[in-house]
Amino acid sequence: MHTTLLSNSMRGAALCTRVSSTTLNPVTLQTSAIYQTISLKNQTRPSSTSTVRFLKASPTLRTSSARPQAQIATSCINAKNTISVRSNSTTSTSAREEAAKLDWNSYFKLRASRRRYTLASSIVSSAVSTVVGVQVLSSQNLENLGAQVMGLDPFVVLGMATAACGAVGWLVGPFLGNAVWGLVNRSYKKAFLVKEKEFFDRIKRYRVDPSSNSMTNPVPDYYGEKIGSVQGYRQWLKDQRAYNRKRRSFIK
């Protein structure tokens, strides 16, 4: 009797344990699944918010990184402009200082010396080119060939060729003379060029209009080549005024 009661009670306990395990297992599974989904959401949310924040912050970063580049570019442009202005001002001041070292009388003296150098070099170069041309023509017997082609006397052809060689040397002479003069007077070259520019500006400003030129009223030294001193420049100005007076009186 007792054994049957004990066995029945044990069976009931076993059944209870089975029922409890079968009924509780789905609940535990559901709770574990919910916990996993919550944990996954918690894991994914920070990453999504961080990406959104990064995407939102990226334009500001781009703009902030672009602003220093624009500032650097503008500063470089301003620096270049200031450097160019300073260089122009320094060149103008240096040119004025160089021009101040040379007065007008010294400028006219240097101008006359340059003209003498160019004239002497033209004479020398024309003589050299003539001698060389005669030697080349006589050795190559080109005068006979020219006489056959043009039908002229060989002496005439030789004379024309010699004159052409001398003309070439005369034209080349001023370039050589200017080069030699620049080497001799290189200490005054910059100041001389500044004074020369100023002188020709004055000539262009005060010279007369050559459209009304005539035999009775010729243009007085249109390019100012005869001016050799300050007194000569003043006389040139007087001649220009006299020409204008004659022109106005003739028109009236």
Swiss-Prot record:
Q: What is this protein called?
A: Presequence translocated-associated motor subunit pam17, mitochondrial
Keyword Membrane belongs to the record? yes
Protein function: Component of the PAM complex, a complex required for the translocation of transit peptide-containing proteins from the inner membrane into the mitochondrial matrix in an ATP-dependent manner.
Transit peptide region: 1-87
Subcellular location as annotated: Mitochondrion inner membrane
Cellular component GO terms, alphabetical? PAM complex, Tim23 associated import motor
Species name: Emericella nidulans (strain FGSC A4 / ATCC 38163 / CBS 112.46 / NRRL 194 / M139) (Aspergillus nidulans)
How is this protein positioned relative to the membrane?
Answer: Multi-pass membrane protein
Residue ranges crossing the lipid bilayer per the database entry = 117-137, 155-175
Q: What family is this protein classified in?
A: Belongs to the PAM17 family.
